[in-house]
Amino acid sequence: MLKFIGTGSAFNTKLGNTSAYIKENNTLLLIDCGELTFDRILSLNLLDDVNEVHIAVTHTHPDHIGSLGSLIFYCYFIKKIKPIFHAANSDFIELLEIMGITEEHCEFDNCAFDPTVVINSLDLGLYFMENNHVKELMTFGILLVKNPSLEEHEYIIYYSGDSCNIEDNILEAFVSGKINYLYQDTCKADYDGNAHLSLRRLAELIPVELRGKIFIMHTDEGFDFDKAKELGFNIAEIEGGIK
């Protein structure tokens, strides 16, 4: 299961930028790296006992990539680790190059040509799935498949990134049991044209009996956590608590 460095929306800085990770077998997989994330990584000592770093990002809004360059340079110059950046779109790599990051500092894995990533040390497959957030950017959710080489996977997680809905194919796979857990961008704000999914809409989409497999993240200020729990949803928890 995923652990979280932060669970807040762009302006809900009290909860930090939403960023998830898996740390096993001396390997760190980080999903998104917003403005506040690098500092939090250091305070949690997440790079201790790590010799392999994988980074995947869902899109290029600042609360998802704001400290990405600092993390890559720190890994390379201080930890002597060359991280692997799994990019769902070529623009993501171009953005790093504008920051002065080259293939000397970071291995670029351009998933636009092959959307399937296998991290052998974690026995984990990543699959980027285009979703719907804002018209200005290409944005992605990520399927995480444990034991991808086996016919019977240990589990399949869908991580929504930022999204104003749940794509039909993802929802169908979740309801049918093909996806075991869903981490979903959810907000209090509820209006036409919202770039995020409201709690009201989430409750309309997810049957009551399946809500225990949903973890709410990327919450905005004033989000009603008690109501979400009463509706049967889980809340993604920040590792080490709120700072």
Q: What kind of feature is each model-predicted range?
A:
Residues V50-I55, H105-C111, Q184-D185, N234-E239:
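Short hydrophobic/aromatic-enriched beta-strand-loop microsegments
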Residues C164-K243:
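Cap/insert and terminal regions of metallo-dependent hydrolase folds
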Residues I78-P83, S90-A112:
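Active-site neighborhood of divalent metal-dependent phosphoester bond hydrolases
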Residues M1-L44, N110-N169, G240-K243:
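Core dinuclear metal-dependent hydrolase active-site scaffold
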Residues L30-G34, N51-D63, H86-A88, I157-S163, ...:
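Active-site neighborhood of phospho(di)ester-bond hydrolases with catalytic His/Asp-centered motifs
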Residues A20-Y21, L46-D49, L71-C75, V175-G177, ...:
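Glycine-rich, phosphate-binding/catalytic loops in enzymes
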Residues L36-I84, K178-Y181:
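Active-site metal-binding motif and surrounding structural segment of the metallo-beta-lactamase
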Residues S90-F92, P115, T219-F223:
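Short, polar loop motifs at secondary-structure junctions
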